[in-house]
């Protein structure tokens, strides 16, 4: 699986690797809103750590749908997920998850995410890496050109907000 180092020459990353001005504005991102639901909480009454994984993946799903890349589901396994938990979120609280593409490698896609509750402070921050693996492939496969173009040029997408 391709989880190569960010200085890989064919990688596009925020702020370096290509020298292209404005590259950070070209990489896709999205903000989604959800509520902390009853099954999201633990015995202490605040959100369970595993809920952040679902919120990050829900943001990824919304982003890929917006980009017309829903067909990638099933061919982009996660190879890394990490999160730092900074604040509690409580049942019923509105939660905003921002997911940003930070790097597009030959076959990898790196995301960063931030989860906010109703306050300004981040409740969780983290990153996730997926790789492209075509059907029946035994490992990672390069992004098709059309997919790579979208992943490197689509820019911020409209938010998916609660009504």
PLM region spans:
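Hydrophobic beta-strand-centered segment that forms part of the acyl-chain substrate-binding groove
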Residues: 61-109, 123-125, 130-131
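Core beta-strand residues in small-molecule sensory/regulatory alpha/beta domains
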Residues: 114-117
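Residues that cap or initiate secondary-structure elements
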Residues: 40-42, 89, 105, 119, ...
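Hot-dog-fold acyl-thioester-processing enzymes
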Residues: 2-80, 135-163
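Beta-sandwich strand segments
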Residues: 121-122, 140
């Amino acid at each position: 699986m391709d989880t190569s180092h960010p200085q890989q020459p064919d990688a596009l990353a925020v702020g370096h690797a290509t020298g292209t001005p404005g590259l950070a504005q070209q990489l896709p991102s999205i903000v989604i809103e959800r509520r902390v639901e009853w099954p999201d909480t633990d015995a202490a009454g605040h959100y369970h750590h595993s809920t952040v994984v679902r919120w990050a993946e829900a943001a990824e799903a919304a982003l890929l749908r917006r980009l017309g890349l829903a067909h990638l589901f099933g061919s982009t396994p996660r190879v890394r997920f990490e999160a730092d938990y900074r604040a509690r979120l409580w049942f019923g609280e509105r939660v905003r998850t921002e997911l940003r593409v930070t790097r597009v490698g030959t076959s990898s896609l790196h995301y960063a995410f931030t989860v906010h509750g109703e306050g300004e402070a981040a409740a969780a921050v983290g990153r996730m890496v997926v790789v492209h693996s075509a059907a029946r492939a035994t490992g990672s496969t390069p992004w098709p050109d059309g997919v790579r173009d979208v992943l490197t040029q689509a820019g911020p997408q409209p938010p998916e907000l609660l009504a």
